[in-house]
Amino acid sequence: FTHSKVGKPGTPEEERTPLNACVWRYHPVRHEFEVFAHGTSNPWGLDYNEHGEFFTTACVIPHLYHIVPGGRYQRQAGQHFNPYTYEDIKTIADHAHYAGDIKDNAHWGPRAQGGLNNASTDMMGGGHAHCGLAIYNGPQFPAEWRGKFIFANLHGHRLVTDYIEPKASTFVGHHGSDFLRDNDHWFMSVTQKVGPDGALYITDWQDKTTCHRTMPELWDQTNGRLYRISYVPVGVQALADEKKQSPKGYTPTAPFDLAKETDENLAQLAVQSENAWF
């Protein structure tokens, strides 16, 4: 993997922080940069739950990890900087979102023009490559969605879900149902985030080439979309359809300024668990 040495402009090489796949953090006030955990592969999704536990999704290697400070996690390639890392931390997932061999759904295999060659892979979630992560802790979706992990499956052109339960000092991740399937082969969600209003916001890369294809003539640089997904109860939707109106299930969050709140109100916001933004 590409190595980096991070430091402010002018920092000598020996004083920089080396990276070769990791999760890092930066303190915006103290201007401090540090590696939080080492390893994984293409960790393109990172979020934390209501208890402050961090999780990441990885691409190609097993997809779900519980991230703890100082942890050293499974790599796709290369070596950990610490030569005494005799065994690294593996995935918490008890499943995959594909069946058979990775090459059946990868760019180097028979899948050249898209689509899924393996019906079992389609049923399991679409493929081996994942991107983004949103742990739903918002006020809008039904209660059964709280704590669900929502992330993209690139080859499956969909959003999939996992859910966790405690196990010893960590968790085990279980296979959930698909959240969204798109009928557009160009659909590739890169980021999923829960907004202050409780809606799910997702980006769509929109490109013909799903993954790893160095074919500039096929790259599309004119599209790209941002979606907001809101929960509307079935009855409300049916009534809206009958009246040929837009459903009234989305209510914008009223403007707020936490700097104007009293200490008592701030304390109440700090301990509530309905909305992770407050």
Feature map (PLM): residue ranges:
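Beta-propeller blade termini and top-face loops
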Residues: F1-Q268, E274-F278
